[in-house]
Amino acid sequence: MESGLAGSISGDGLARIKQEKPEWLLQTVASQATEKDKENIFQQQSGLPPCQTMGRPRALGSQEETGGTRWAPLPEQDAPLAARVPGTAPGPLSPSLSAGGGHFVCVDCGKRFSWWSSLKIHQRTHTGEKPYLCGKCGKSFSQKPNLVRHQRHHTGERPFCCPECTRRFSQKQHLLKHQKTHSRPATHTCPECERCFRHQVGLRIHQRAHARNRLGARVNLHEMFRYAAARRWSCRLRPGSPRGHPEWVWLGLCRSWWGQHGVRTTAHSRLGPSEQRQFICNDCGKSFTWWSSLNIHQRIHTGERPYACPECGRCFSQKPNLTRHLRNHTGERPHPCSHCGRSFRQKQHLLKHLRTHLPGAQAARCTSCGQSCPSRAALRAHQRVHTAAELLRSQSAVRDGVPGSESQAEIAQSVVVKPQGPQGAKEVLCGQECETLAVPSEQRQFICNECGKSFSWWSALTIHQRIHTGERPYACPDCGRCFSQKPNLTRHRRNHTGERPYLCTACGRGFRQKQHLLKHQRVHRGTQAPHPGPEEEL
């Protein structure tokens, strides 16, 4: 049998071995060589250390495609080493081999990977496997780095710091995105006021403000304020300049035009991040730094609610609102108190509860049971429970004939009010009757056993108890949403029917709810007094 090695003896008596051409040697030992041997031959031929060829694709195809493990050299450096029949010229590789790719192929989508671990992680997208579980909220992830980034939301860790402004971020990509605001020059200049912008879209939005300025210069400035106030109510903003911003920023106007007309801005009119907001809502004039924030805000005007609850069908405009709502169905309480171990569904409820553990919370502690309350108002509401319990015990003692309980029963009877008619109420104090115009909350005769709140009517107590029981007997026939009170269902159905029964007598605009009409009528009070309806005159 021919051998790929030829031997010779030198003059010093030592045997020397001569190695033949690598391609012929490879053809000879291809059937017996292992993958490691072939890799060593390639590295010796190319003159590269093992670290430079490690991880590069050397095998293409899978056992399902070729009927076995297929081995092929690299198209750039290892083409001369491909096994071929002696005497034939080396031809080009097939397209499947020269296209490159990884050693490991996904059987579901055909994507190739150079490492087995990469293929294993990729296959979790097809199987849905998420082996990394968060110990705080129970959310699972397919990769460990995603879990590490998620846990920073619970711990509040922000390891990435901006060297320019020392602002910190929980993810590196957020830091890189933020650093562009420092490095990117403001090359887009407004020809009218010479204000500079980093993005072309910011300049276009700013130029729209100039167009509005030219139109607004021909109208009264007070009319502009009233129009902006009317749009502001639909945006759920409070009266006045929002968050202390200057009026020209709030209205989306140009600062130079605002200064030329001698209009005085607010006291806090320093240049700051609020004045660099580029995305302005066309409906109410509110400005935002990010396009995503403006997109979410515009759902207030359009009424879009793309996030639906799979349990009850209720829709929300933002995903965090849906997440908090789902905890009502699952019972999840991801926010525990570090002092007493009590858990809450929302973080704001936890912060409110933590006030009871502060040193000053001793002043709002119940003297009967020792329970701490977040405020004195909550303490008074809590003490009504003890008062109601004492009244019920005294009344039951009178019915059972317990001696010495008549005095307590007389006290209990003195604080019970019995309505006598629509003109007023009669109360019994010190054995005398007198008419009262208002019944104090402590003298209402129907008391809730859960929270101690009192009511003058049994129907009001029945409606109130649905808060504790969760009963919602009034269902919408269109979307299935349920309500605890019928008036709430009536107002909700106007969203489906489009009915607007409350009309403005000044401009004829219709509203679904009366409170929206009353807010709107404040716009007309500067020019003409609104005509009160029959319900407002009462």
Swiss-Prot record:
One of its GO terms (cellular component) is nucleus. A zinc finger (C2H2-type) spans 104-126, 132-154, 160-182, 188-210, 279-301, 307-329, 335-357, 364-386, 446-468, 474-496, 502-524. Keywords: DNA-binding, Metal-binding, Nucleus, Repeat, Transcription, Transcription regulation, Zinc, Zinc-finger. One of its GO terms (molecular function) is DNA binding. Residues 35-73 are annotated as: Disordered. InterPro entries: C2H2-ZF_domain-containing, Znf_C2H2_sf, Znf_C2H2_type. It is found in: Nucleus. Gene3D superfamilies: Classic Zinc Finger (3.30.160.60). May be involved in transcriptional regulation. Belongs to the krueppel C2H2-type zinc-finger protein family. Its main location: nucleus. This is Zinc finger protein 775. It comes from Mus musculus.
